[in-house]
Amino acid sequence: MAPLPGAELVRRPLQLYRYLLRCCQQLPTKGIQQHYKHAVRQSFRVHSDEDNPERIQQIIKRAIEDADWIMNKYKKQN
């Protein structure tokens, strides 16, 4: 299960960035939202110079899996 509809449509880094920020808006408190938004921004900056298409797809896949895990974690707590 993907955290938000549209995960299967993410193909490019900018799409991933927007998708992950939308996921952050679904988290329960402002503090948690800000924490994960900061983490998304930092990751985007760290990987901004990546130019290998295979590696980019690997990063996108992993980021969506991580977002799924985080969303499920907070769903179970509520």
UniProtKB/Swiss-Prot annotation:
It comes from Homo sapiens. GO terms for cellular component: mitochondrion. It comes from the Eukaryota. Belongs to the complex I LYR family. LYRM9 subfamily. It holds the Pfam family Complex1_LYR. This is LYR motif-containing protein 9. InterPro entries: Complex1_LYR_dom, Complex1_LYR_LYRM9, Complex_I_LYR.
